[in-house]
Amino acid sequence: MMEGLKKKFNSWLWGPTSGSEIDISLDGKVVAITGANTGVGKETAHEISRKGARVIMLCRDTVKAESVRKEIMKDTGNQVDIVKLDLASLESVRSCADTLTKKEDRIDILINNAGVMACPEMKTKDGLELQIGTNHFGHFLLTELLQPLLRKSTTTGFTPRIVVVSSMAHEGPMWPWPFALIALGLALLMPRFVKIYWMLLPRFRMNWDDLHFQKIPGSYEPFIAYSQSKLANVLFAQELSKRVAKDGIKVYCLHPGLIDSELWRHHKQKGSIGSFMLAPFEYFMKTPFLGAQTSLYCALEPSIVNESGLYYSDCAVASPSPVALNEDDQKKLWRISEETVGLSKKNT
């Protein structure tokens, strides 16, 4: 009962959530989703499987993924596969892409959903700051390597889509934890007017001189690093949409909402200040099911099939930070990304 009330309250608070209600058959379609074993990714996979697609779960934890795979297949009766993917390892990303290239004839929809948020300072296996390494660089490499499979989807008459899950956090915060919770509170309690808050802050930008917080000891701030990784998502989606337009691939970027999911795990440890400060907000957060709605909308909605390079929130076009629309920054991030993951122009 409480979950039902929360769902209704969330729908009123956050606006329309119509992704699951899209009447479309995905019979015969192949949809790959990163981080599909938990939270928003799990709900996205479940709903897409219900519409007839064969879902490929790209997950680091294959044990948890297997349990979810069985759950989805039991409910929908449709095939669900698992391919191991650790986005914090470029070697794992390449291995995943190689497996898919050998096994699959095509991929119709790719949803870059997985992510890590506001974690303590850590590095990927390649020495990158963990959040931008996982949320951006890992997905950048995966998307580039899977483009041949996505292009093959066009031969079936289908318009392939790439969905990039970002966050409104790409606009900030400039302030470190715990002040970032001020933004969270305003976003939850006044979602219709949250832009006013962001307008009061200096424009958040990529730290081009030190993307990985290595030059100044102690400069790492979890929420600033997260915001940077989410801004990278939007910049990437913008530039990607231009580069794949000639191939007939459409690109969508989105803010899923503030969601009560495992993303908060680093701040919900029992007895921590984060757990104490988050407690009043949890009821106002979207459930993972509601958080999946805009991903589903971008992946499935027929009326936006000719749109590409736009940013969405609550199943509607929204305005990203003006910084994300800077074409020089889009190109700069692309060059840095190619160098970081070891892709030359002739490889892409």
Predicted features by range, described:
Residues 57, 85, 283, 322-325:
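Pocket-edge positions in alpha/beta enzyme catalytic cores
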Residues 4, 8, 276-279, 283:
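Low-complexity, intrinsically disordered, cysteine-poor segments enriched in small/polar
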Residues 93, 229, 278-318, 325-329:
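C-terminal helical subdomain
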Residues 117, 318-319:
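Short, active-site-adjacent cap segments at secondary-structure transitions
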Residues 322-348:
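C-terminal amphipathic/interface module of NAD(P)-dependent oxidoreductases
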Residues 271-274, 333:
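A catalytic-pocket lid/entrance helix-loop region that shapes and gates access to the active site
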Residues 4-272, 340-348:
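Rossmann-fold NAD(P)H-dependent dehydrogenase/reductase core
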Residues 239, 294-297, 336:
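Generic recognition of well-ordered alpha-helical segments
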